[in-house]
A protein has these predicted regions:
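Structured interaction patches on ligand/partner-binding surfaces of diverse proteins
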Residues: 100-130, 137
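C-terminal motif of bacterial Sec signal peptides marking the signal peptidase cleavage site
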Residues: 13-16
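A short, amphipathic beta-strand motif
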Residues: 27-35
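A short tyrosine-centered beta-strand micro-motif
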Residues: 92-98
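Short, ordered, surface-exposed loop/turn motifs in non-cytosolic proteins
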Residues: 37-72
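Short, surface-exposed beta-strand/beta-hairpin micro-motifs centered on an aromatic residue
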Residues: 79-88
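Short coil/turn motif common to extracellular beta-sandwich-like domains
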Residues: 24-28, 43-45
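Positively charged n-region of N-terminal signal peptides that target proteins for export
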Residues: 1-4
Length: 138
């Protein structure tokens, strides 16, 4: 009887453990990365769009929490259609980001992150993230 009680206590202890966000699940996060090429209209001074382009070969990073200051846990390089996906994820909060490049007034190039947040609330789910749109000035 004492052994049965110990086994039941251990079983309850293991079943009560909530696994954190990360790999080991059955859900997917997917999305796309676009570049938008713009230029400054000389007659109006406004920024006008030249064209959209799918951004292939762009790294998209994932953090297994909603904390943007943590180091990334995994990355995915977009395919020829600018698509990425992270598979085998558990329920939880996730942060995705990619880098956009920019030039300041002194012609110094620098990268800055663009963040997206998503929550997986059920197993076996496909979760789409709003597209990353990276502006490229001409």
């Amino acid at each position: 009887m004492k052994n049965l009680l110990i086994i039941c206590a251990i079983a309850v202890g293991f079943s009560a453990c909530e696994k954190p966000a990360g790999e080991g699940g059955t859900s997917v996060i997917e999305g796309q990365v676009y570049k938008i090429h713009t230029f400054q209209n000389s007659s109006t001074g406004a920024m006008d769009t030249l064209y959209y382009q799918l951004d292939s070969g762009k790294d998209v990073f994932i953090i297994y929490s909603d904390n943007e200051t943590e180091v990334y846990d995994d990355k995915f390089e977009t395919d020829y259609n600018g698509r990425y996906n992270f598979e085998y994820l558990r329920k939880g909060d996730y942060t995705l980001y990619t880098y956009a490049d920019s030039i300041d007034v002194n012609n110094v190039n620098y990268d800055y992150p663009i963040f997206k947040h998503i929550k997986i609330s059920s197993n076996n789910s496909n979760n789409s993230v709003e597209d990353f749109v990276i502006e490229k000035n001409q």
